[in-house]
Structures are given as C-alpha cells and as structure tokens.
Curated annotation (Swiss-Prot):
The gene is H2-Eb1. GO terms for cellular component: late endosome membrane; lysosomal membrane; MHC class II protein complex. Belongs to the MHC class II family. It holds the Pfam family C1-set. InterPro entries: Ig-like_dom (IPR007110), Ig-like_dom_sf (IPR036179), Ig-like_fold (IPR013783), Ig/MHC_CS (IPR003006), Ig_C1-set (IPR003597), MHC/Immunoglobulin (IPR050160), MHC_I/II-like_Ag-recog (IPR011162), MHC_II_a/b_N (IPR014745). The keyword Repeat does not apply. SUPFAM superfamilies: Immunoglobulin, MHC antigen-recognition domain. This is H-2 class II histocompatibility antigen, I-A beta chain. It comes from Mus musculus. Residues 32-121 are annotated as: Beta-1. Keywords: Adaptive immunity, Disulfide bond, Glycoprotein, Immunity, Membrane, MHC II, Signal, Transmembrane, Transmembrane helix, Ubl conjugation. The keyword Zinc does not apply. Residues 122-215 are annotated as: Beta-2.
Length: 264
C-alpha cells in the first residue's frame, strides 16, 4: 500500500468563541482557543488498482465527521458531527464532488508522486549487538538494528548456527524517521553458548541480495585474548611509526653535513 501525506483541507481554522471586556484584556489574555481542521487521505492498493479517499473532520483533536469513498456518504463519528453529516448528505452536488475525489484528487496526485515515491530505494544500515555485556550461558537479548531504509516493506530474520529462529523474537515494528526513511529493531531472546554464531538476515527491495550480519558468542577468556591481540598489534604499529620517524630524521641530518678533509 502506498500512502500520500495527509493534507490539511485549506488551513486550520481558529475560532475565538469568548469575548472579553477591554479592561480585562489589558490585564490578562485568558481567552480559550478552539481548533477545527480537516484532513484528506488517499490509500492506494496495488498502485491505482484500488483507491480509497477519506475526508476527516476534527474539533479540538477529536474526529467528529468523515467521508469515506468506500461508503459513499458522510458519517458522523460523534454526535457533534451528526448535523453536518445530515446536511451534506442531503446535497447531491457535495456528494458527487467527494465521490469523484478518488479520481480528481487521489489518482491525479498519484501520477505526480509516482516518479518520486514508487521507484525510490534507500538501502538499510544493519548492525547487531547484545543488550547486556555479561558472561555466556546467561539470558541475553540480541538486537538487530535496521535503519534508514525506504520503502517500508522489509523482512528481518534471525538464524542460530544456520538454523532460523522462530520463537523468542520481539520487534518494535516500523518506525518513521520523518525524512522519508524508516527504522526497526528486531530482537532475539536467547542464552548464548560458546562458539554459537547468530546471524541477522535482512531482505529489502533496495537490495539485490539479502544482507547478513553475524554475532559470535565468545567466552570471557576468548574476548580477553582477542583484545590483548588487538592491543599488541596497535602498540606494535606505534613503535614502528616512532622508529621510522627517528630513522628518517637521522638520515636527513646526516645528509646535511659536509664530509671533512675535502678541498673546496
């Protein structure tokens, strides 16, 4: 399903319903504000094969009236919207205009946005990490973070030693970033054992092949050995760099000296 952004019908209409006397207004502005606005929505299924148009009316953030193209007339959501629903349903020209909006508004705008929204693809960024840094054989939660992708249809699966995990999976669902991209967290509840390999696999329309990111369960001693190895490697690089610096500095100093005993 493709969804167009909700568009205010004209603008938010601010109604000031309380009139204060001039002396009071000079002292303190305590007038209440009331907000009435409407939203137009277009819902598309399989492109423009099936289109649904909604016109929703709100008063103080509460919906009270709507027109649904699937219904073909106005329906009151609360008692406040009932008089308007009865009034507009009695006017054929208003109903004809709203029913035609499926074509004049929704399909028309779909053609405008089609070149931008439908072909647009943004590849996801995938990272895997545990929520707790504790010894193995303890309950832990592995997180597969999938971020900054478009469109929103995405499939995330967990594997342990090459076998797909079907239970213990929790997801945040699709989260909108507000910049035409999405993110989601898919977590696996497990008790990691030494030597196990956990894999998060992501499939998305922007990818020609699934993306896989691995997390290997290691004992504390193995982690310490790995950190020691990395630390030794970095320390070796530092000493090598210092040695090369001293060597080239000495070479430069010697080349600047004139040999003694030669006639000039």
């Amino acid at each position: 399903m493709v969804w167009l952004p909700r568009v205010p019908c004209v603008a938010a209409v601010i109604l000031l319903l309380t009139v204060l006397s001039p002396p009071v207004a000079l002292v303190r502005d305590s007038r209440p504000w009331f907000l009435e606005y409407c939203k137009s929505e277009c819902h598309f299924y399989n492109g423009t094969q099936r289109v649904r148009f909604l016109k929703r009316y709100f008063y103080n953030l509460e919906e009270n009236l709507r027109f649904d193209s699937d219904v073909g007339e106005f329906r009151a959501v609360t008692e406040l919207g009932r008089p308007d629903a009865e009034n507009w349903n009695s006017q054929p020209e208003i109903l004809d205009e709203k029913r035609a909006a499926v074509d004049t508004y929704c399909r028309h705008n779909y053609e405008i946005f089609d070149n931008f929204l439908v072909p647009r693809r943004v590849e996801p960024t995938v990272t895997v990490y545990p929520t707790k840094t504790q010894p193995l054989e303890h309950h832990n939660l592995l997180v597969c973070s999938v971020s900054d992708f478009y469109p929103g249809n995405i499939e995330v699966r967990w594997f342990r030693n090459g076998k797909e995990e079907k239970t213990g999976i929790v997801s945040t669902g699709l989260v909108r970033n507000g910049d035409w991209t999405f993110q989601t967290l898919v977590m696996l509840e497990t008790v990691p054992q030494s030597g196990e390999v956990y894999t998060c696999q992501v499939e998305h329309p922007s990818l020609t092949d699934p993306v896989t990111v691995e997390w290997k369960a290691q004992s504390t001693s193995a982690q310490n050995k790995m950190l020691s190895g990395v630390g030794g490697f970095v320390l070796g690089l530092l000493f090598l760099r210092a040695g090369l610096f001293i060597y080239f500095r000495n070479q430069k100093g010697q080349s600047g000296l004139q040999p003694t005993g030669l006639l000039s």
